């Protein structure tokens, strides 16, 4: 019997490559299961993993086998029932056992579905696969505080982790050649002189000279051996310098309507949408700030806790939120240095002529500063004035203004993917 002993020092994640290959192979099954899981989960249960089941028929390997049809001549072992020339009845069915759906059977075999668990990281990978912030640009920072280490040749000083082995060995070889060359030349001359002296007639030889040459040869050989293979003088280190870089910093304004017209069901849908957005940004972008704004008749910037869990409510003036967004941009986020995004969720109900004010704010001020604006209307009913005014904004900015309607919780994830799908750079 053969035994395989794994002596790798790191015993963790040995099958990571095989697992990734498996996830890639059954990607379509997993994505369907992940989408169903996202639609049925509550807003507080979005970050855990998921158990996935794949039907046995989908994981079976393709094989070649004889089908039930066709004419065949075979030689079977002897038996007591048949003799030469007897005709055998062809088996019925499709050549398979009797297992599967339907009534019970006393024949055949079957297999349960193959089930496995996705980790939290794998689950979120599939949730946000193929999504990205639209029109994300690199902005040049005025204070140049965004730097990136870049290679800038080699240096004689540095830390061991930056040692350049190839350059160090090249320097060591050059030093050895340079130091050993004169010694080898002197050694060669001494050996030739000794050989010449020893070839002389014994009467003419100079024993003292021979002794001096042998001593000189021994001294030179020791000098050759003393030349070190590598010396601290030979060491070279990769030199890194901090180079100012453009930044892809971004800020996302999350604007949620909490007015009295928003039912608890509407608010839960809005929270689930923003939670998906929050997880997406937190997972995929290191330098994205989030600004949370709740509004009814008045808008207020709040923290994450208050945004998701506060029970404050009131009337509806949407323009108060857009005005606050414009003020915050003017105070803290220069469009020259930041990529600016807005995600708004509302039921579409607004106070009298305020929808026209919202359109004017967007057309005259906000859209010139923003990379992308998304509006989600949560209602099963027909659209109202706010949607109609926003349609005019979308017509003027078709690539940077997006609108979608959500009727039920099952629409959240598909709508989210439509709004933030990766776009081909123009």
Curated annotation (Swiss-Prot):
Signal peptide: none
InterPro entries: UPF0229
Pfam families in the cross-refs: DUF444
Region (Disordered), start-end ranges: 82-109
Stretches with biased composition (Basic and acidic residues): 82-93
Family per similarity comment: Belongs to the UPF0229 family.
Protein name in UniProt: UPF0229 protein Csal_0882
Organism (species): Chromohalobacter salexigens (strain ATCC BAA-138 / DSM 3043 / CIP 106854 / NCIMB 13768 / 1H11)
Lineage: Bacteria, Pseudomonadati, Pseudomonadota, Gammaproteobacteria, Oceanospirillales
